[in-house]
Amino acid sequence: MATSELSCQVSEENQERREAFWAEWKDLTLSTRPEEGCSLHEEDTQRHETYHRQGQCQAVVQRSPWLVMRLGILGRGLQEYQLPYQRVLPLPIFTPTKVGASKEEREETPIQLRELLALETALGGQCVERQDVAEITKQLPPVVPVSKPGPLRRTLSRSMSQEAQRG
């Protein structure tokens, strides 16, 4: 199966705003595949000859960064599919305007970043309402050390206990 690929690169730079954008994606894939239901097989038992031929087709897959995918067979038209939106990196980077500012003066964390942080903590198994061990032990009743019992004192005399055992 032969395959050819075409990649695209786009880069943009804005010197005034000090911004840059760069993207690369695999745009077009053309592959030769055996065509289903298009094969020929002949066998001549007298001459001990066989002939086999498999039909081939060129499959086309075209992707775009706008979440559109086109699939089909070369020469027969392509079927277009709109892919579902998926959040991918890079996320917009948040930097506070005043690094040394107090908590009230700072800007709020962007919603996308808050959602990502919440997802990471949920997937990481971290508990939001986490308490230290010292705080948990403060809520417990105090631990009373177990005292060792002394030697057991007999309440019955030896002769009475032997009689009780005999029945």
Swiss-Prot record:
Subcellular localization? Cytoplasm, Myofibril, Sarcomere
Q: Could you give a GO molecular-function term held by this entry?
A: BMP binding
Give the domain of life. Answer: Eukaryota
* Short name of one Pfam family: Telethonin
Q: Provide the Gene Ontology terms for cellular component.
A: I band; titin-telethonin complex; Z disc
**Could you tell me the keywords of this UniProt record?**
Cytoplasm, Phosphoprotein
Return the Polar residues bias intervals. Answer: 157-167
Q: Where is this region: Disordered?
A: 142-167
* Classification via InterPro entries: Telethonin, Titin-like_dom_sf
* Biological process per Gene Ontology, one example term: cardiac muscle contraction
Residues annotated with Phosphoserine modification: S39
Q: Does the keyword tRNA processing apply?
A: no
Q: Does the keyword Phosphoprotein apply?
A: yes
Kindly state the subunit structure of this protein. Interacts with MYOZ1, MYOZ2 and MYOZ3. Interacts with CSRP3. Interacts directly with the N-terminal Ig-like domains of 2 titin (TTN) molecules. Interacts with ANKRD2; the interaction is direct.
According to its UniProt entry, what is the function of this protein? Answer: Muscle assembly regulating factor. Mediates the antiparallel assembly of titin (TTN) molecules at the sarcomeric Z-disk.
Its name, as the record gives it, is Telethonin
User: Source species, please?
Assistant: Mus musculus (Mouse)
